Every structure is written in structure tokens, then in C-alpha cells.
Amino acid sequence: MTNYAIILAAGKGTRMKSDLPKVLHQVAGLTMLEHVKRAVDTMNPAKTVTVVGHKAELVQKVLEDQSEFVLQSEQLGTGHAVMMAESSLAELEGQTLVIAGDTPLIRGESLKNLLHYHKSHKNVATILTAEADDPFGYGRIIRNQNAEVIKIVEQKDASDYEQQVKEINTGTYVFDNKRLFEALKEINTNNAQGEYYLTDVISIFKEADEKVGAYKLADFDESLGVNDRVALAKAEKVMRRRINHAHMVNGVTLTNPASTYIDSDVIIAPDVVIEANVTLKGQTKIETGAVLTNGTYIVDSVIGENTVITHSMIEASRIEKNVTVGPYAHLRPNSVLEEAVHVGNFVEVKASTLGKETKAGHLTYIGNAEVGHDVNFGAGTITVNYDGQNKYKTIIGNHVFVGSNSTIIAPLTIGDNALTAAGSTIHKDVPVDSIAIGRGRQVNKEGYAKKKPHHPNNK
């Protein structure tokens, strides 16, 4: 049977108190909508239709060519939202999943189980349900004495008895596609909210004596719909717990999982050690044997085998194997550290490549530079790469020794095996095998200090 999907993503999310559409708030590095779409993709739908409304262009940009889009210009309820997909789906044979775009914790495996249950029981509609300790605010699943689903009642429309029911509607369903759109023509706004409830189609099916079933989630957390920042924080916590657990099962050591923040798309090899208070974001990849110590922050970067990062920040950079970084180093975007490089405390590297076995031990800024292998930067070295309007490149060859407190004014080239004297300002090219000295000659004036107030003889 052919599968289709409708993702409901039109709402503003007033309780989020945000200019950003609700479904675009992030959980573990992805928007809620992206989490839902990935779960939906596990069922291999022939067509996915996303219903957009508030700031539709922003929502569409997230999925781009991954979905069809239909516009719900007025938000008149979930039933009305699904009606918007009629022109795309109504005439197709198959089964259609309807899911809200603000349910980021739903697992693809659960959706596949829901579809299998729906098909194997020959239902016209199947509701994804969950058991809630506190069901307040959720629609309730009402069953008869034979445990058959007879209707869904929204919180505001529920009787006192119905409000005691703990089985709740998660807002996710599978329908026979054609019957769904036929039933939608029969619903109305005769309810406390004055909206078209999608749940009313369940009553229509029951009145027609058609088979309606319910598949209950084993994990209530999957049912969480995010309507405010409190729920967003809860979703974040649950998702990060899942992510961390998966990495540990796969051979990664997390010394304190509760304080480790790893985004959804981060890839980590076995035998990586991650200490407390580490954050890994975006498209980061950590290779085997790496050690990330307390307080390290890495985004969109590759960290090579057996590299040690100590309390440092790495952004959009590539670090090869056997490198040491930190403490308190900062690699800004487009930096490359080749094998066995050492970047020490209070060193900043920006848009530069450092060749194999190069060392910048402390208090150094390297920007817009191409550095060869086995180069040593003395403390206090600065590449002066910006004149207020343009950035300029520094090229440093192999086996160069840069003396402490050197200021290198780009653009220039320092040749292989050259040296710069400590304290020099270098503003011209330095030839191969040369030493560059760019500082004033020292002059000692004997006895001069005796005239100054600090001298003991003058106190």
C-alpha cells in the first residue's frame, strides 16, 4: 500500500512568545520540523505535503525540495489544515499519516509500527496514543466496554468523567486516504473552540460503522508536543539524553553525560573520551582516540585521531591526527591544523593552515596565513592581516623560527629555514635561510637611572 504524509506546520505558536514560527525552534541542533520530517521519511512516503501558514516562506526554506507545500492562510483548526492538502492527495489510493510539526521526539520506528498496525488491522483510521500521568490539556481517547475506540474528546469539551481518562491523543494518525478527505467534508465548527477538529472524523467513521483503532506508544516522551519554552527545554533534555546514550552504546566515553551537549548530526567514533561541559554542534565529526576535555566547544569541525582538545573553542575547522590544542585556544572558521601541530594557551588561529609539527605555544594570533611544516612561533607573535578595509595573506615556509613578540605585517613571505629576531616588526619578504631583524638598536645610558624618583638614593 502506498504511503503519504501530511505535516502540520502552519501555526504561529503564540505561547512561544517568538517571532520565529514554532516549528523552526531547534532541539539538539535541528528544527522541530526537521526532526519530524526525518521520522516521516522512515516510512518512505510517495508524497509528503507540509501545511504552512505563519511566515510560510521561512518554513518552506527549511524543507525546500523535500516536500510539497500548501498554504493555510487562516488557522481554523487541525481539520481545516488537513483540508488544505485535498488538491494534492484526495484522489490517491493509499494510507496517509497526519502529524504535527511540533513533535520532535517521535521516532521513525514508532511511525513504522503505527503504519503496520493500521494496515494489519484493516482500519480506516488509527490513532497514535500514549498513557499520560497528567493528561491535562490533551484530547482523551474514549473507548467502549469492549475497549474499542469510539471518539476523541478535546480537553475543553470533555465531561468530568472523560477528563479522568489517561489515554491521550498524540495528534498523529493514519487514515485511509480517500475516506479521510470524504469525512473532512462533513465536519463543522460546533465546539468550544469554534474550529474544525480533525478528531471529529473519528466520530464520523464510527457513525458509519467503520473500523477505528489505536496504537499506544511505549514511551510517553515521544508524544510531547512543544507549545512553549518549558516544553521546548523538556524536549531538548530528552533528545540529548537519547543522543548521549546512543554514543555511549557505540563506544564513546562520556564522563558526565548530564553536562554533555551533542547535536543530532554529530558523528563520533569509538574510543573517544569526552569530559564534562563539552558542547559539540552542527556537522562536527570526532575521530577515534580523540580526547575533549572540560569546557571544550566545537561546531562544524573535524577532529582527527588521537587529538587532544583542552578547554578550547573550535569553529568550522579541520584538525588532523595527533594534534594538541589548548587550553584556551580559539580556532576560527576555515582553519586547518595538520598532523602533530601544537596550538597552546591563548592562541587564536583564523582562516589559516598550519603544516605538520608546527608549534604556536602561547599568546599568538595567526590570521589569513599559510604556514609550512616544523615552524615555531614564539610567544606574542602576531600576523597583522587587516588594514581596516582588506585582509592580506602571510606565507611562511618550512622550518621557520619566528622569534617571540614578532609582528608580521602582511602581505609578505618568509622563506624556508628563515628566522625572525625576537621583538621584530617584519614588513618585507624574508629570503630563504636568512634572519630578519626589525627592531631599534639597544642603547644603554650608564647612571641615567640615578636621576629618577624610583631610585633608592632619591627616596
From Swiss-Prot:
Keyword Metal-binding tagged: yes
Please provide an example of a Pfam family that matches this protein in its UniProt record. NTP_transf_3
Q: What is its main location?
A: cytoplasm
Q: Which InterPro entries does the entry link to?
A: Bifunctional_GlmU, GlmU-like, GlmU_C_LbH, Hexapep, MobA-like_NTP_Trfase, Nucleotide-diphossugar_trans, Trimer_LpxA-like_sf
Residues that bind UDP-N-acetyl-alpha-D-glucosamine: 8-11, 22, 72, 77-78, 139, 154, 169, 227, 332, 350, 365, 376
Enumerate the residue ranges of region (N-acetyltransferase): 251-459
Task: Give the signal peptide range.
Answer: none
As its record notes, the protein acts as a catalyst of: alpha-D-glucosamine 1-phosphate + acetyl-CoA = N-acetyl-alpha-D-glucosamine 1-phosphate + CoA + H(+); N-acetyl-alpha-D-glucosamine 1-phosphate + UTP + H(+) = UDP-N-acetyl-alpha-D-glucosamine + diphosphate
> Cofactor binding mode, per the note?
Binds 1 Mg(2+) ion per subunit.
Co-factor requirement = Mg(2+)
What is the annotated quaternary arrangement, including any partners?
Homotrimer.
According to its UniProt record, which protein family does this protein belong to? In the N-terminal section; belongs to the N-acetylglucosamine-1-phosphate uridyltransferase family.
- The protein depicted here goes by the name Bifunctional protein GlmU
**Gene name on record?**
glmU
